[in-house]
Swiss-Prot record:
It catalyses: GTP + H2O = GDP + phosphate + H(+). GTP binds at residues 19-26, 83-87, 138-141. Gene3D superfamilies: P-loop containing nucleotide triphosphate hydrolases, Translation factors. The keyword Phosphoprotein does not apply. Residues 10-206 form the tr-type G domain. The gene is tuf. This is Elongation factor Tu.
């Protein structure tokens, strides 16, 4: 077994537990760490329940969220797992993406079946782009009637299908987190079965370097005799010297140019990768043709838009947000990547106003186009102060 220590090549995945309050998300998280620790002691340490339950508060863009992070390994993979103690913490985490999830374990108590927060979490998972779900039907030891278990399973599958997840096909594993924590061998096996389902059914996400090149522009300056240089952190993909790129966003027309040189820390590079803070020299571009807030992209891979639907969390007064509600036609700034753009908010029918601390859907019309795709995160600001955070759920124009 000593060999396992040396394996650093395991794929790394981010997952989390979602579901209704008191259905056993935190107990399940603790049970996973315990059972994997018992089976693979040299790979895992057990994290006790109370340590997960008293999750530290984090600030993501000024929003206070309690999140517990645990890590563990199966034979195949290394997992970072997030669990939020409170319902509001989930909503905030999912909308702001404070902890990104490549997949989720939906915990449903067999004794209750799907409850209101089960639905809300699944809806949010769909909207914010959590791509895969595996179901843990928890407290299965407390239901003796096989028919009831089958009915609850059917209900969960229907709920998932209604939100466009493959409800008929995804795995539903019957577990008892509490019994597994107490050391019951049969139910410990159910946790292993659950993790096998996660290993097999939550695929690895594409790596950032495999996605098409995109770099938000942070700064622009001209170097005498050489031309115009733009700097920024490459968000995804790879760019090579002498490749053609498009500059899009903010202005109505795109600009096409060639990257003639790439530098990082004043050293010349042949290519820039996702995560690099790079300076790109652009051929035939004048200083005034580009500005902060635009994006440099692989031609044709992303388009600028002005109108979209979003799921948004509005900061509470305690988090430094607004003290008063806002109404239809609210006009704050929307901060995308590196810049603010003013937009007009349209609230969904039946929503008169939005209070600080609420989450809501909205439609936004920006006064300038921004390079965007579904899932893009933004902050809502008033005079430089963050009052909300959101994600694009659908592009309209």
């Amino acid at each position: 077994m000593a060999k396992a220590k040396l394996e650093r090549t395991k794929p790394h995945m981010n997952i989390g537990t979602i579901g209704h309050i008191d259905h056993g998300k935190t107990t399940l998280t603790a049970a996973i760490t315990k059972v994997l620790h018992d089976r693979y002691p040299e790979l895992n340490k057990a994290t006790p329940f109370d340590k997960i339950d008293k999750a530290p508060e984090e600030k993501a863009r000024g929003i206070t969220i309690s999140i517990a992070h645990v890590e563990y390994q199966t034979e195949k993979r290394h997992y970072a797992h997030v669990d939020c103690p409170g319902h509001a913490d989930y909503v905030k985490n999912m909308i702001t993406g404070a902890a990104q999830m490549d997949g989720a374990i939906l915990v449903v108590a067999a004794t209750d079946g799907p409850m209101p927060q089960t639905k809300e979490h699944v809806l949010l998972a769909r909207q914010v782009g959590v791509p895969y779900i595996v179901v843990a039907l928890n407290k299965a030891d407390m239901v003796d009637d096989e028919e009831i278990l089958e009915l609850v399973e059917l209900e969960v599958r229907e709920l998932l299908s209604a939100q466009e997840f493959p409800g008929d096909d995804l795995p539903v594993v019957r577990v008892s987190a509490l019994k597994a924590l107490e050391g019951d061998e049969k139910w410990a096996d159910s946790i292993i079965e659950l993790m096998n389902a996660v290993d097999e059914n939550i695929p690895e996400p594409p790596r950032d370097t495999d996605k098409p090149f995109l770099m938000p522009i942070e700064d622009v300056f001209s170097i005498t005799g050489r031309g115009t240089v733009v700097t920024g952190r490459i968000e995804r993909g790879v760019v090579k010297v002498n490749e053609q790129v498009d500059i899009i966003g903010i202005k109505s027309e795109k600009t096409t140019t060639t990257v003639t040189s790439i530098e990082m820390f004043n050293k010349m590079l042949d290519e820039g990768h996702a995560g690099d803070n790079a300076a790109l020299l652009l051929r035939g571009i004048k200083r005034e043709q580009v500005e902060r807030g635009q994006c440099i992209i692989k031609p044709g891979t992303t388009t600028p838009h002005t109108e979209f639907e979003a799921q948004v969390y509005i900061l509470s007064k305690d988090e430094g947000g607004r003290h008063t509600p806002f109404f239809n036609n609210y006009r704050p700034q929307f901060y995308f990547r590196t810049t603010d753009v003013t937009g007009v908010v349209n609230l969904p029918e039946g929503t008169e106003m939005v209070m600080p601390g609420d989450n809501t859907e909205m439609t936004v019309q920006l006064i300038q186009p921004i390079a965007m795709e579904e899932g893009l995160k933004f902050a809502i600001r008033e005079g430089g102060r963050t009052v909300g955070a959101g994600r694009v759920t659908k592009i309209l124009k």
